[in-house]
């Protein structure tokens, strides 16, 4: 079997495989749901010996508004807390910030082919998800929990699609 077949089978076995995405820059690109309703990507870039697991998250407009109204000190502390906490997960990340307000963040981690096993794949998927979830918890802690009837969850969190 090929790496692509192995990875797809492992994802399907655990009922997280959603679809294969067209991606001219990748040998394969799978969109997964882990956990249910949380979109993530599993990608093998062309001519690389690595699998990238990633999750992008768009910050809810309500949180953006609350951040925009926060003091500069509160914004800076929040961004510092997000960065230091993400570093504890040993993941890579990119914060998209406009005027000291977090707009979006992308969390990724890699598995090199020589370390690719089903166990390594799912531990990495879980680590990326937990890092994303931690950012959501920090947002809710610092700027309020938006889980009410007037707020719809935002699931615009696919890294590439």
Identify the residue ranges that each predicted region occupies.
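Charge-rich, low-complexity N-terminal segments
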Residues: 1-50
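Solvent-exposed residues in well-ordered beta-strands and their adjoining turns
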Residues: 35, 56-58, 110-112
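Glycine-rich, often proline-containing surface loops adjacent to acidic residues and nearby aromatics
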Residues: 49-53, 100-113
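Ampiphathic alpha-helical segments that act as solvent-exposed interaction surfaces
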Residues: 70-90, 113-146
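Short, internal acidic amphipathic alpha-helical interface segments
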Residues: 57-104
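Short, highly charged C-terminal tails/helix-capping segments
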Residues: 140-161
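Short, well-structured hydrophobic secondary-structure segments
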Residues: 38-69
């Amino acid at each position: 079997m090929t790496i692509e077949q192995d990875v797809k089978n492992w994802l399907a076995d655990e009922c997280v495989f959603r679809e294969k995405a067209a991606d001219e820059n990748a040998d394969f690109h799978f969109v997964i749901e882990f956990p249910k309703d949380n979109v993530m990507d599993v990608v093998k870039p062309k001519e690389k010996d690595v699998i990238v697991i990633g999750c992008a998250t768009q910050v809810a407009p309500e949180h953006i508004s609350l951040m925009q109204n926060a003091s500069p000190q509160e914004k800076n502390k929040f961004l510092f807390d997000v960065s230091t906490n993400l570093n504890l997960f040993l993941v890579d990340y990119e914060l998209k910030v406009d005027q000291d307000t977090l707009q979006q963040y992308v969390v990724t981690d890699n598995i090199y082919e020589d370390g690719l096993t089903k166990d390594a794949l799912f531990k990495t998927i879980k680590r990326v998800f937990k890092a994303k979830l931690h950012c959501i918890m920090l947002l809710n802690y610092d700027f309020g929990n938006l889980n009410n009837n007037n707020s719809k969850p935002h699931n615009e969190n696919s890294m590439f699609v």
